[in-house]
Amino acid sequence: MSNRGASLKGLFLAVLLVSNTLLTKEGVTSLPICPIGSVNCQVSLGELFDRAVKLSHYIHYLSSEIFNEFDERYAQGRGFITKAVNGCHTSSLTTPEDKEQAQQIHHEDLLNLVVGVLRSWNDPLIHLASEVQRIKEAPDTILWKAVEIEEQNKRLLEGMEKIVGRVHSGDAGNEIYSHWDGLPSLQLADEDSRLFAFYNLLHCLRRDSHKIDNYLKVLKCRLIHDSNC
């Protein structure tokens, strides 16, 4: 096996170990949603929201960590932050800027928006996890976080689709999402341009994961605790 292959195998083992440790600490994987072999298992909406909120918080934590690490290692002195304003592919989706704005939106619309943002990240996260391996001397900590975020975003999307199906009467909502066409930017030959593309994508990921985290807390408070939070 090549050194790179051995390194990647070790990376994925590290992903499993660290993610299981962190998720267990957060209480996300403490119990299966339904016991194996159970029939007609019905998980409460409150429990579904508990898991979604914990998972979204974990994703935002990882997104902040990977952005900060990338910023410190590759972005210093390059002026990336001044160019990274309003450059997110999800900007086409009208999203509340904070909890106060989110509280003004009907819960079904806010649920659809959460699902739409999560769907919008499916494709870019898949390519982030693969293309980040091509960055010169990329540390394993950045690599495994990219892989882990992609996996956990899929888990959160699946959980949110269950919540939407439970909350919505009849129609499970429109399949809204924002298309991402940034793969060529992650493969540019010019190093500065390529690194900025990664920086901008991670900057947007941190921003959107924070929004999702806030929206889910608002939704949980409204739907589970009757806004008494």
Curated annotation (Swiss-Prot):
Domain of life, per lineage: Eukaryota
A GO MF term: hormone activity
Main location: secreted
Signal peptide: 1-30
Keyword Kinase: no
One cellular-component annotation, GO: extracellular space
Compartment list: Secreted
GO biological process, one term: positive regulation of canonical NF-kappaB signal transduction
Keywords associated with the record: Disulfide bond, Hormone, Secreted, Signal
InterPro entries from the UniProt entry: 4_helix_cytokine-like_core, Somatotropin/Prolactin, Somatotropin_CS
Keyword Signal among record annotations: yes
Annotated disulfide bonds: 34-41, 88-204, 221-229
Family of this protein: Belongs to the somatotropin/prolactin family.
Name of this chain's protein: Prolactin
The species this protein was found in: Gallus gallus (Chicken)
Lineage: Eukaryota, Metazoa, Chordata, Craniata, Vertebrata
